[in-house]
């Protein structure tokens, strides 16, 4: 007879853009609606979501719209509910550490957005609590599950690049100020006092991307900027942008084999897109190069590399983009958030650690913190090892 395990997941902060679109709409609901998933031993795992948020009207509306039986505006009661297995958090950064700490001390498994905390000290404390509590803790590392980066990582594993020399990334798009056209990101993102800022937000992503594609991040040199000093909030009220809206970073990396690699990532909410995707990474090596976005990845082997000659007197006649070949998926690649959710849920049921946990998240917070320090002190800063 087939065994069935029911996992109850409380989802806090799903009225926000990412919490709703990626975690609820494209991950948990499709898993639920498919009847769950089956483990290697034949056990059927079914998901029961519980929607949690501060706005009762929004939460009730979402619950009714998506046929979710349970919802609550009382996070504490949900955390202390013995029938709840997992607390997921996608709320404001400034509220996250307290929520995660409370959940783990109550014996709940946690799955969370990043950053896990506003300070490295808090992030390390969370990692310690998770280890002591013996819960399964997972942190969203969505970009490593995206088709483009899955293909890029495969090229690394196959030795396509030879010795890797560098990785460079371009991320960002124009976020409207909110006066004439509404901003497509929440206003708290641009207020430092509310946990906003490009460096705080994105360096925790870049840490796991650099670790996952290349290797250990050894140092950081960053320059931040607040390019747009005045914005308008959701109510149309003018406010001062106190957080950085762009961050330009240079990183020293080390591959598992001990090779030194230079990384460079530009991140900006004040840039107009002239590239194929909103984020792109280019890896260059002695034997080949590749460019990966969210979905697509193209590569150029050493044997197929053209030999351009600098001549500013003549127009360029060759199309450099046409000289790259698309890397095939060779597999069905699902939504990145959904893939990690399924992996995390399997780990919870099996009672094992998730490969992207709170220590990885702490390294992301550390990189953001040291990036801001690098900007303030105008120097390169070495990154020390974190120990629990």
Swiss-Prot record:
Q: Which UniProt keywords apply?
A: Carbohydrate metabolism, NAD, NADP, Oxidoreductase, Plasmid
Query: What Gene3D superfamilies does UniProt report for this protein, alphabetically?
Result: Dihydrodipicolinate Reductase, domain 2, NAD(P)-binding Rossmann-like Domain
Query: Cofactor binding mode, per the note?
Result: Binds 2 Zn(2+) ions per subunit.
Pfam families from the entry? GFO_IDH_MocA, GFO_IDH_MocA_C3
Checking InterPro entries in the record gives: Gfo/Idh/MocA-like_OxRdtase_N, Gfo/Idh/MocA_oxidrdct_glycsds, GFO_IDH_MocA-like_dom, NAD(P)-bd_dom_sf
Name its co-factor(s). Answer: Zn(2+)
* Keyword NAD annotated: yes
Record pathway: Carbohydrate metabolism; D-xylose degradation
* UniProt GO BP: D-xylose catabolic process; protein homotetramerization
Enumerate the GO terms in the molecular function aspect. Answer: D-xylose 1-dehydrogenase (NAD+) activity; D-xylose 1-dehydrogenase (NADP+) activity; NAD binding; NADP binding; zinc ion binding
Q: What is its EC number?
A: 1.1.1.179
Reactions catalysed, as given in the entry: D-xylose + NADP(+) = D-xylono-1,5-lactone + NADPH + H(+); D-xylose + NAD(+) = D-xylono-1,5-lactone + NADH + H(+)
Instruction: Provide the induction entry.
Output: Is induced by D-xylose. No significant levels of expression can detected when the cells are grown on various other sugars such as L-xylose, L-arabinose, D-galactose, D-tagatose and D-glucose.
How this chain assembles, per its entry, is: Homotetramer.
Member of which family? Belongs to the Gfo/Idh/MocA family.
Q: What does this protein do?
A: Catalyzes the NADP(+)-dependent oxidation of D-xylose. Is able to use both NADP(+) and NAD(+); however, the enzyme shows a very strong preference for NADP(+). Is likely involved in the first step of the oxidative D-xylose degradation pathway.
Name of this chain's protein: D-xylose dehydrogenase
Q: Which organism is it from?
A: Paenarthrobacter nicotinovorans (Arthrobacter nicotinovorans)
